[in-house]
Amino acid sequence: MKKITAALLCVMLVICTSVTAFGATKSDVKQKTDTAVAFAFDGNYSKNGYDVSSSKNLYILARSGADISAYTDAYFKSVAQAASESKLTDPGTIGMAVCIAKAAGIDPENANGVNLADALKNADVSVVSSPYNYFYAIEAAKALGLNDTVKALSDTLAKYYTVGTGTDFWNGYGTSPDDLAMFILAMKTAGAYDEYTEDAYKLLETYYTENGYSNYGANADSTALALAAYSIAGNTEKADAVYDILIKNFYDEKTGGFKADYDEYYATADAVFALSFYMPIAQEDGQESTTAPETTTQAQTTTAADNKNSDTSKKSPSTGVEIAPAIGAAAVALMAFAAAAKKKKA
């Protein structure tokens, strides 16, 4: 009887401490990416083509792996016009143009006559318009081997960060999960300010809820950008867990896009962006699911907690998977075996 009880207790402990994070295979991620592109881009953004003012959407489309050749002529004519009018000044916009050129097989040093590499190298790093654009600029500078530009951009970006409170790009309005995620992407790409990046991950977790990452409510955009932030670090277990939440709570099987209260096309574009980071670390087809660790970083108490949802059901913070049923099942099995053993002994 003691041996049976001990064995069952071991099983119960294994069940209670090993919650599976399913994540997705590369085929799963590609399928979600393809339907999202069809919804947000084929069905909306791509209908009128792209110019320099819509660089972000063409950049995301290029990141998805879609064929962008139908749009590049008009786009780079627009870039050339902006350059000729001295309007191509934001390093982020230049960075996106560089990445688009590379994706299309166009030389960034001669994109419709514009030397984008020189434009990025000579741009004023203080005129970057958003945390997103710091990432785009750093990504492009890194790809072009412009190490001094990468350093100048990351040094300027770091001035917006305070350890313990995060970023503030908005003159006192503070940080958000979206800004923290983009800060992480930029600094991870630059390979700079590791102390700030680690702090940003801790702060990002204060926005975690079981329904997704919350910015005045759980939403697809914040959850997707958190997925990108964990993916770029190669944190497969955490990325798998966030991916599961993103798909479960925000993917729309009917449209193939991602749900949002205000703009489903915008939310879907952010999801496509995030999936491009997750794809390299997603499971190979046929690979078995991994097992999430027993615990994850606990959310710290900050003012961000005011924005969280109040769902109090007990789930693993690593996966969002309910653990009570597993505990209950193990307990029932234990009692059943104990009763059977007692009856047999009698």
Segments the model singles out, each with a brief description of its role:
Residues I15-Q31, T312-I323, K342:
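Sec-dependent signal peptide cleavage junction
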Residues G43-I68, S86-D107, S126-V150, V163-T197, ...:
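An alpha-helical repeat/solenoid feature that recognizes helix-turn-helix modules
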